[in-house]
Amino acid sequence: MSCVCRQSIMATMAELQKRSIPEIAAKLEQPFSMVDVALVGDILISVYICQGMVDWHRHLDIDELFWVYEGAILLESEWGEVRLQEGELAVAPKGVGHRSGSEMRASVLLLRCGVIPERKNGRRRLYAIAGEERLKRVNLHIAAQSVALPFQFQTVARVEDSVLQVAWGEGTWSVEIPSPDNLFLFVLNGTATVRTTESMLHLHPGDFTIVPEGEVYQLSTTRDTTLVRMAREM
């Protein structure tokens, strides 16, 4: 089975806009319907409904990161299988056959290269690294607990030349150096306020925003807040 329907709600974000993953997922009615929600550098972020099982397939040119927001899925591959629960993710590397499925409805974020690979700039891994040969499951909550210091983003996964990172902290974070590309900020737990020179947003669990490229921004968070960030690796 392939995706029944694919949509896009991406917009050019000159200023901060709040988006909600549960609200987006609630509007997807059919199994394997999908909506593109953001383009961060070269990485396209989509939300899809996993219910049933897709056919086996492989992508010769792109990695795919599966991040379960709600529910649970089985990700099968030529490297074995992993069961992903809410807040867990795994990367199916380029060239590795795989498929995803779930008996019950699950909301999943899918991250992969959104531009033609031949037109990409910068570093690219052209094939799966020998010796890996297994899917690695990452629990974002556990990964955040392993970060020793507050306000320090730590990389937990890579997709092409971009990194997915987690951090925790309470209070005001240091002002971030402007990024040459836009970046994705997601609230896993707690509440975060994002400020730029143009706007301010309050984000709650399941909310995300895109910080425009070159924008100076600052975060402030409440107790027990965990954030997820995706940006191009510097």
Feature names for model-found ranges:
Residues 44, 53, 72-74, 81, ...:
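Structural motif
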Residues 32-33, 51, 61, 93-95, ...:
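Short beta-strand-initiation
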Residues 49-51, 58-77, 111, 168-170, ...:
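Short, conserved beta-strand element in jelly-roll/cupin
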Residues 94-123, 204-205, 213-234:
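Ligand-binding loop in jelly-roll beta-barrel domains
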Residues 78-95, 197-214:
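Short acidic-glycine-tyrosine-enriched beta hairpin
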Residues 41, 69-70, 85-86, 104, ...:
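A cytosolic small-molecule/anion-sensing beta-strand core signal
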Residues 2-46, 118-166:
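A short, N-terminal "cap"/entry segment at the start of jelly-roll beta-barrel domains
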